[in-house]
């Protein structure tokens, strides 16, 4: 079965990098987010791997980059969708937030006509997230805070606890969802998500 995402068709056994274009700068230059898709020849679940929701959390970005560089994202069955940097503005400026001062992880699921951060959340939630059967989101300790490597999951979820044990981080932390976060949006639509935290931002 072909996967049609962001207007592009990807067949089983194919790989493709698609540009997720959601806004223009004042110079009319498009702002594009690379979306790396790998499909096995055998059908199976789709795993969405993201990082860089906060632009200064570069450890997560590098983890996803290494997953791609080492071909860990090539599945035996099913599909992987990798987005190393969701907040390109923040990443380029080494800033947690968007240029409008908003935190992308506090505006989900976003609105079509809202702030820049809200529009990114909206189009990501509408155009990419529905394809995911499982989500894995990589973060780094914010505001120069060091976080021990850990997986954060929603409390009282046997499925997430099982997935966390498979990931096998040194710590599994049961944390309630924060309003308007990516994790909360996944929870509301019934898509399991593991959130990884590790290290310190800007390092």
Predicted segments, located by residue:
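Structured catalytic-domain cores with a bias toward divalent-metal coordination
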Residues: 1-203
């Amino acid at each position: 079965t072909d996967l049609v995402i962001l207007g592009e068709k990807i067949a089983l056994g194919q790989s493709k990098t698609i540009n997720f274009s959601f806004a223009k700068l004042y110079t009319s230059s498009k702002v594009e987010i690379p979306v790396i898709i790998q499909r096995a020849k055998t059908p199976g679940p789709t795993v969405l791997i993201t990082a860089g929701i906060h632009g200064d959390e570069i450890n997560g970005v590098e983890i996803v980059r290494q997953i791609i560089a080492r071909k860990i994202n090539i599945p035996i069955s099913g599909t992987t969708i990798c987005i190393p940097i969701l907040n390109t503005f923040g990443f380029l400026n080494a800033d947690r937030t968007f240029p409008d001062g908003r935190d992308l992880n506090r505006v989900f699921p976003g609105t079509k006509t809202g702030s820049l951060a809200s529009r990114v959340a909206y189009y990501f939630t509408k155009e990419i997230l529905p394809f995911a059967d499982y989500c894995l989101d990589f973060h780094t300790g914010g505001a120069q805070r060091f976080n021990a490597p850990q997986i954060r999951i929603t409390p009282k979820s046997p499925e997430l606890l099982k997935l966390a044990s498979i990931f096998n981080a040194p710590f599994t932390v049961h944390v309630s969802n924060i309003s308007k976060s990516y994790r909360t949006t996944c929870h509301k639509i019934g898509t399991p998500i593991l959130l990884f935290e590790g290290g310190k931002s800007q390092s």
